[in-house]
């Protein structure tokens, strides 16, 4: 009888150890599953920017298009201008001339100059109105704004241009505690930026129980 008890005790101990190990594995997996991820995005890769380029975010929607920042002036590709928010701009590639027409005037600006004419009358800016880079034609944002109803916000490191062509109100919410915003919904998604307690966040949209927001320093 004593021999049976002696054999039973080691077997019980081994079984208990296996149970404890399995329980520990389960606990670790549960903790890992519900612990928020700490890995961050490569912010330049996230916004697809490099060098003097800046990301173009149009009406709070990220695009694959880029804008140029040259001598502290922002330049937008003419194709993005005409396709997104002002079809009245026309680029004459033969003459190297940007043309804009209204009911009363014809406005012209040659590439690489700070001068433009309004129905023949000369005017000047402090920047080159049109820049050419290979096959691409870029127009200064400040010049575009003269004839286009748009608002914009620009942020650095990395460069991000938020263009708004629509009016309207939007909701905001204040962060109740220090937090982060993530690339996608889910606690394991990569971190894009930190959020301070009390920071005002612009609500963009609700997605599957998660809220897409824009931070005060221009991250979405």
Where are these regions (language model features)?
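Primary recognition of N-terminal secretory signal peptides and signal-anchoring hydrophobic helices
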Residues: 2-207
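Sparse recognition of residues in long alpha-helices and their boundaries
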Residues: 160, 213-214
């Amino acid at each position: 009888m004593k021999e049976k008890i002696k054999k039973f005790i080691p077997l019980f101990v081994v079984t208990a150890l296996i149970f404890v190990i399995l329980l520990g594995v389960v606990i670790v997996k549960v903790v890992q599953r519900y612990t928020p991820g700490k890995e961050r995005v490569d912010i330049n890769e996230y916004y697809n920017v490099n060098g003097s380029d800046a990301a173009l975010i149009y009406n709070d929607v990220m695009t694959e298009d880029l804008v140029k920042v040259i001598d502290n002036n922002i330049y937008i590709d003419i194709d993005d201008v005409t396709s997104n928010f002002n079809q009245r701009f026309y680029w004459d590639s033969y003459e190297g001339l940007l043309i804009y027409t209204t009911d009363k005037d014809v406005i012209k600006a040659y590439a690489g100059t700070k001068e433009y004419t309004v129905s023949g009358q000369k005017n000047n800016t402090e920047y080159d109105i049109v820049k050419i880079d290979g096959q691409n034609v870029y127009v200064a944002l400040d010049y575009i704004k003269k004839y286009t109803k748009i608002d914009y916000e620009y942020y650095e490191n990395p460069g991000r241009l938020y263009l708004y062509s629509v009016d309207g109100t939007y909701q905001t919410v204040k962060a109740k505690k220090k937090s982060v915003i993530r690339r996608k919904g889910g606690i394991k998604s990569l971190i894009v930026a930190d959020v301070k307690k009390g920071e005002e966040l612009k609500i963009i949209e609700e997605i599957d129980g998660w809220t897409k927001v824009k931070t005060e320093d221009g991250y979405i």
